[in-house]
């Protein structure tokens, strides 16, 4: 990066953009976007990024998470992860960002034909997800006087398309949450559930929804929508 101004935030923002992550500036020390349209202005354009961080050299760096799913675990010792070594190992394949309050961000890419959005506390208490329509701050951004940083040996070093997919059990739970929010599918052929897979897929989704604490009524309502939107053709109601 020789020849660039001696500005650590600018250098980092350009590095993320060169990897393929769309960035935009947030207020120094905060998570609030500095640009009028926030994440909608996220870009990999190096000229625009240079302009932003030349004007606001201390601005934090936000990365748009469309096409990604970032598992946002709040605080140290979160019960969802602390005592589960298998889960820790599964998540450990992903780049990991350490947050100022002792939490972690695990960076995955969304599998093909999925279209997940953000969730807050739905996966587990104090566990959020950032996906389509979301963003996260990245190192070396600073909040409350403390920086974000990359976990040693788990730094972000690959473009978005080379990030790992979530483990299978996590995909099931995220799909279940998407179903409960009415945002499972975008209607593309890749999201269709063909004859021969409908019952098995709905049963799998029902089990995943149950594991994330949804009620029987919520599960039934979500399955009806999945059946109507994705099953080709839809199953009779009595089979849902």
Report the location of each language-model feature.
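Signature for HUH/AEP ssDNA processing cores
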Residues: 1-102, 111, 192-199, 214-220
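Charged, low-complexity surface segments at secondary-structure and domain boundaries
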Residues: 1-3, 33-40, 68-70, 148-163, ...
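Modules that initiate DNA replication and primer synthesis
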Residues: 2-4, 17, 22-25, 112, ...
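Generic, low-specificity signal for short hydrophobic/alpha-helical stretches with a mild N-terminal bias
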Residues: 53, 120, 152, 187-188, ...
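Metal-dependent DNA replication initiation modules
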Residues: 57, 61, 77-175, 220-240
